[in-house]
Swiss-Prot record:
Protein name per its UniProtKB record: Small ribosomal subunit protein uS15c
CC annotations in GO: chloroplast; ribonucleoprotein complex; ribosome
GO terms, molecular function: structural constituent of ribosome
Gene3D superfamilies according to UniProt: S15/NS1, RNA-binding
Length: 90
């Protein structure tokens, strides 16, 4: 597993203050998603991890939708920092 995949965009002092913020939650979900993706490259038949990955992806998608409605500027900054594609709109 490559450690460069995990991002440290948020400084340590901000991590301690804002653990409940939307940005921090999306940041944590992104790290979990990248870790699970790396795991699933080696263990293709780990169906429980696949299910967990889909659940985390859904949670992150809902948080990003909330953030895009509330504050579009912070949403664009976060997507740029975490290198996440913007979801397609229906």
């Amino acid at each position: 597993m490559v450690k460069n995949l995990f991002i440290s965009v948020i400084p340590q002092e901000e991590k301690e203050k804002n653990k409940g913020s939307v940005e921090f939650q999306v940041f944590n979900f992104t790290n979990k998603i990248r870790r699970l993706t790396a795991h699933l490259e080696f263990h293709r038949k780990d169906y429980l991890s696949q299910r967990g990955l889909r659940k985390i992806l859904g949670k992150r998608q809902r948080l990003l939708a909330y953030l895009s409605k509330k504050n579009r500027v912070r949403y664009k900054e976060l997507i740029g920092q975490l290198d996440i594609r913007e979801p397609k709109t229906r």
